[in-house]
């Protein structure tokens, strides 16, 4: 991922989420600024890995990210809305996980945080052998379903 990907990611992945859950323009601006700073900080961090997926014409398709927490990695997938419901998510996620685990042999568990309403994500993670663990309120104040997959013992 490069710094010039930040606005593309925000526009294609985060803007709809922000508009849905935050109504105040001041809050939206703050979230946008936080988003930009977060990505700038994490691009060069050893505790985060971000993979960008593009189509043949170099259009943004998806992003997967991993936050490394000792022997656990928190995984996220964000798919451009223009590419949803076309069967790409599971293939992208599977490819991303394989690459990540190949490069990070110390990881034993993957953790996914999924909004309860996101049925597609639940199905994809379940298809990849993730198991529901618990419900948890995360950093953004929203409640998420926590799915885990043990990848090494």
Show which residues each predicted segment covers.
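Generic macromolecular interface patches on structured domains
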Residues: 19-20, 28, 45, 102, ...
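Generic structural signal for well-ordered alpha-helical scaffold segments
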Residues: 39-40, 101
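A general structural-boundary detector
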Residues: 22-23, 40, 79, 112
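A short, well-structured alpha-helix characteristic of acyl/acetyltransferase catalytic modules
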Residues: 1-36
